């Protein structure tokens, strides 16, 4: 659209008065060609609206005013020319009627009565339209769920969360955080709309007339066809019950003010990012652990160092803090809207009270029909949350070094030459470099030390001494041979080659340290000043090297969480398997370091069969190593690997009881876990009814019985509403998490639909418990879940009240728990006082325990339990 300074001008491609007719076009100086006479479907005036070379046949109701005609014209511009639309288009257009009998061909339409049947009305852009008007094009933002990692196009940071992570513009397709909504400039390009501009408004049943005409459509049809294409205002508090919620960018007045500001070059400073961020110039990820890129100190623009020279000089100065929205604009948003936009928690998961999203599957064109059917239910499927990503163990280790090596030992002084291959777990001595047959394996976990050549008593007379020694508990290996004055002797004997093997073995013994922190020249890599804290006997020893006590396997990644990576390991002397959490101090701030120390301090004070055992902690200037007992797997793995994607009631009762008993011990010591979820419930064995232990106390807090805390902790998918709403919370926070764990165990889905407020869903039991699978689950289980998922903390069940619930007080569950206690050799779940009660129960049942209704409830699950046991064994 081009503004006409002195006389009205047509919209794109429109010929003005007195201009020659375009080739093959229409001569507007002569009477227009006879238009097809299509009878109007009802009372009203039918006429053509022409914009450039495009005509649309519309039907105007008889009682309509000129404003209605202008709205139709704006709708056509949005549909046919989205790149030409701008803010305030309605006030900047004029309507002219073609009158071939008049000296002035175009007659200004001043009212709807001026339009007669069959007229041709030209839409013309007024000369009052300014350059700023063309630049202001508001976004039409809707809440969107992303199935792949996405980044905010305003701040460059990743959109975090399971579902509803951010906002997507219906016009240009750009993505934004909800918290960035009020800072987004109104610069929608309409790229997505432009793909639709070649279709007619009545595309479902239209026939093109001439080059650009279509069948008539009524005003209602035209409005409906363009509803989804027009930028919409955010909903007011009175319309909060609508099926969809929309956001717009910053106020138009602010955009006009910023356009008048002088744009200056950016002031870039090197910046370290704590969240994944993309360069806003090239849209590529800023890679690295720290100092990844440059950030403008005024407008916070992020880019690579190499892209800084290509960034235009368009800095608008210091960004407004909480000042982007005037009071009158903020008044249009409900309180729930404001809290959901300003709350940092929205990047981590589902938030009670946040905006809903209608027909999630309909907004994602790339999804298949199968997913659409699943999404129509609206329940979030159970998955491993982003904060605790599980990794599988690689079957084959990476070869670190290989080659021919000469060696002998204190058990056999005969010198041998084998092809050595070093990987992350062992040294394998092959017969040659082409066969799989090997002579010996030396596990790295059995190596106690690698020392320079010291013992020469076994060197045969007249032979060259060895270069270094590998010391294990039973055997000492003497490796290499030092040829006199020949640094590059035969293969496997050269001093340089053997020294390379010594260095490689030292690095393999503690490779996790050396991944990010190369040692200084002349300094032994893994010999660092360290502090060892033994939890079992509370001994603190200085200058203890973890490599002398444990072997860590870097290719056996057990998991990764908030504070670091968990590797498999082995105690060198006893051969006991352990799990080692390795944390790089340089990668997290002091606050998270204090959380780690908090976890260690809590685990030091806990000794319970239902809580993971912490052995010791090692600390170096660069890293922290937390050594714990290694378990078989986690509860989430058991749920996802089951045949139906959920657990039978009998097994769920067995596991939930153990979780509650462990929580009772924690709460007795005034400790609240704060991050309870299936990933943090570990299985001690592959048995179908395993012992479980709680782990990951990084978020745990010391909270008294009647005390409250306000700091935000935990994983949002399992957190209670009071935490997500920044209200005070107490130990009942863990009980909400138990309710969610119980729900996902029995159903395989999270209990909340993403489209409604949690409070509303809890009060609507029919919505929370759909027939599949809850029609096959007992009412007692549903009753316990309802009492755990109580929004009001005072109504939520405690640990003791949950353990006393009839659903858990079942004879078969008691038998399963007693069998587990018999295997463990310790009674810590059940109590002796219950024996008499269950003996009386058996006597009343005529000595046939678990018969009748109890036995009938358990028999159908035998097949499921057998299949689940097989899957756990495979895992």
Swiss-Prot record:
It holds the Pfam family PH. Its EC number is 2.7.11.13. It comes from the Eukaryota. Phosphorylation of Ser-873 correlates with the activation status of the kinase. Ser-707 is probably phosphorylated by PKC. Phosphorylation at Ser-244 by CSNK1D and CSNK1E promotes nuclear localization and substrate targeting. Phosphorylation at Ser-244, Ser-707 and Ser-711 is required for nuclear localization. Phosphorylated at Tyr-438 by ABL1 in response to oxidative stress. Phosphorylated at Tyr-718 by ABL1 specifically in response to oxidative stress; requires prior phosphorylation at Ser-707 or/and Ser-711. InterPro entries: C1-like_sf, DAG/PE-bd, Kinase-like_dom_sf, PE/DAG-bd, PH-like_dom_sf, PH_domain, Prot_kinase_dom, Protein_kinase_ATP_BS. ATP binds at residues 558-566, 581. GO terms for molecular function: ATP binding; diacylglycerol-dependent serine/threonine kinase activity; protein kinase C binding; protein serine kinase activity; zinc ion binding. Residues 14-35 have a biased composition (Pro residues). A motif (Important for ABL1-mediated Tyr-718 phosphorylation) lies at residues 725-727. A zinc finger (Phorbol-ester/DAG-type) spans 138-188, 265-315. The active site is at residue 675. Residues 398-510 form the PH domain. Residues 1-35, 224-247, 332-374 are annotated as: Disordered. It is found in: Cytoplasm; Cell membrane; Golgi apparatus, trans-Golgi network. Belongs to the protein kinase superfamily. CAMK Ser/Thr protein kinase family. PKD subfamily. Interacts (via C-terminus) with LCK. Interacts (via N-terminus and zing-finger domain 1 and 2) with PRKCD in response to oxidative stress; the interaction is independent of PRKD2 tyrosine phosphorylation. Serine/threonine-protein kinase that converts transient diacylglycerol (DAG) signals into prolonged physiological effects downstream of PKC, and is involved in the regulation of cell proliferation via MAPK1/3 (ERK1/2) signaling, oxidative stress-induced NF-kappa-B activation, inhibition of HDAC7 transcriptional repression, signaling downstream of T-cell antigen receptor (TCR) and cytokine production, and plays a role in Golgi membrane trafficking, angiogenesis, secretory granule release and cell adhesion. This is Serine/threonine-protein kinase D2.
């Amino acid at each position: 659209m081009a503004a006409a300074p002195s006389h009205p001008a047509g919209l794109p491609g429109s010929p003005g008065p007195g201009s020659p007719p375009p080739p093959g076009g229409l001569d507007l100086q002569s009477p227009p060609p006879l238009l097809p006479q299509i009878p109007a479907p009802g009372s009203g005036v039918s006429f053509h609206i022409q914009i450039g070379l495009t005509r649309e046949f519309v039907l105007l109701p008889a009682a309509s005013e000129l404003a209605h005609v202008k709205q139709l014209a704006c709708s056509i511009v949005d549909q046919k020319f989205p790149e030409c639309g701008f803010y305030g288009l309605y006030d900047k257009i004029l309507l002219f009627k073609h009158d071939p009998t008049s000296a002035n061909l175009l007659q200004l339409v001043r009212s709807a009565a001026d339009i007669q049947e069959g007229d041709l009305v030209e839409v013309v852009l007024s000369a009052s339209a300014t350059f700023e008007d063309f630049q202001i094009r508001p976004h039409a933002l809707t809440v969107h769920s992303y199935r792949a990692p996405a980044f905010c196009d305003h701040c460059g940071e990743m959109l975090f969360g399971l579902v509803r992570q951010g906002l997507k513009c219906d016009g240009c397709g750009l993505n934004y955080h909800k918290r960035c909504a009020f800072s987004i400039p109104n610069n929608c390009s309409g790229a997505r709309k432009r793909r639709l501009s070649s279709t007619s408004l009545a595309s479902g049943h239209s026939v093109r007339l001439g080059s650009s005409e279509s069948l008539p459509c009524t005003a209602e049809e035209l409005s409906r066809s363009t509803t989804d294409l027009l930028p919409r205002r955010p909903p007011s508090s009175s319309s909060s019950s609508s099926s969809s919620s929309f956001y717009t960018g910053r106020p138009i007045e602010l955009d006009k003010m910023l356009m008048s500001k002088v744009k200056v070059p950016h002031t870039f400073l090197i910046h370290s990012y704590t969240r994944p961020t993309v360069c806003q110039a090239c849209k590529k990820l800023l890679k690295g652990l720290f100092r990844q890129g440059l950030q403008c100190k005024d407008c916070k623009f992020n880019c690579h160092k190499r892209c800084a020279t290509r960034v235009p000089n368009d800095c608008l100065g210091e960004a407004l803090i909480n000042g982007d929205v005037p009071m009158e604009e903020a008044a249009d948003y409900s309180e729930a809207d404001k809290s959901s936009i300003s709350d940092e928690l929205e990047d981590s998961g589902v938030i009670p009270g946040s905006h809903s999203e209608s027909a999630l599957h309909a907004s994602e064109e790339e999804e298949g029909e199968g997913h659409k059917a699943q999404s129509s239910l609206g329940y979030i499927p159970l998955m491993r949350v982003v904060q605790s990503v599980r990794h599988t163990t690689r079957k084959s280790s990476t070869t670190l070094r290989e080659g021919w090596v000469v060696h002998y030992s204190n058990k056999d002084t005969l010198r041998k030459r084998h092809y050595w291959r070093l990987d992350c777990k062992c040294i394998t001595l092959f017969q040659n470099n082409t066969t799989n047959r090997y002579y010996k394996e030396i596990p790295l976990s059995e190596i106690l030390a690698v020392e320079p050549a010291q013992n020469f008593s076994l060197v045969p007379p007249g032979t060259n001494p060895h270069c270094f020694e590998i010391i294990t508990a039973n055997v000492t290996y003497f490796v290499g041979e030092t040829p006199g004055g020949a640094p590059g002797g035969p293969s496997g004997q050269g001093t340089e080659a053997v020294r390379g093997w010594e260095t490689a073995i030292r690095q393999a013994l503690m490779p996790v340290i050396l991944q990010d922190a190369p040692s200084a020249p002349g300094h032994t890599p893994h010999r660092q000043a360290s502090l060892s804290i033994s939890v079992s006997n509370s001994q603190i020893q200085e200058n203890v090297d973890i490599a002398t006590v444990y072997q860590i396997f870097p290719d056996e990644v057990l998991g990764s969480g908030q504070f670091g990576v968990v590797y498999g390991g082995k105690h060198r002397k006893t051969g006991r398997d352990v799990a080692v959490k390795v944390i790089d101090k340089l990668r997290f701030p002091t606050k998270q370091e204090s959380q780690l120390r908090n976890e260690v301090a809590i685990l030091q004070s806990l000794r319970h069969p239902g809580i993971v055992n912490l052995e010791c902690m090692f600390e170096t200037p660069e890293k922290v190593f937390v050594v714990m007992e290694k378990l078989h797997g986690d509860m989430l793995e058991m749920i996802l690997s089951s045949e139906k994607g959920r657990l039978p009631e009998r097994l769920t009762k067995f596991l939930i009881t153990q979780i509650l008993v462990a929580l009772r011990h924690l709460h007795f010591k005034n400790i609240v876990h704060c991050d309870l979820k299936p990933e943090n419930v570990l299985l001690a064995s592959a048995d179908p009814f395993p012992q479980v232990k709680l782990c990951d106390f990084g978020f745990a807090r010391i909270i008294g019985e009647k005390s409250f805390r306000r700091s935000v902790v935990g994983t949002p998918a399992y957190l209670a509403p009071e935490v997500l709403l920044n209200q005070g919370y107490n130990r009942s926070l863990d009980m909400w998490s138990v309710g969610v764990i119980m729900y996902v165990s029995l159903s395989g889905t999270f209990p909340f639909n993403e489209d409604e407020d949690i409070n509303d869903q809890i009060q609507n039991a029919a919505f929370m418990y759909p027939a599949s699978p809850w029609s096959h689950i007992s009412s007692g289980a549903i009753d316990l879940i309802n009492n755990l998922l109580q929004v009001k903390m005072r109504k939520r069940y405690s640990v003791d009240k949950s353990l006393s619930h009839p659903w858990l007080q079942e004879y078969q569950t008691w038998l399963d728990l007693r069998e587990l206690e018999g295997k463990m050799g310790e009674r810590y779940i059940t109590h002796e006082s219950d024996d008499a009660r269950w003996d009386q129960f058996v006597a009343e049942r005529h000595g046939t325990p678990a018969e009748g209704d109890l036995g009938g409830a358990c028999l159908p699950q035998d097949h499921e339990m057998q299949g689940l046991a097989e899957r756990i064994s495979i895992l």
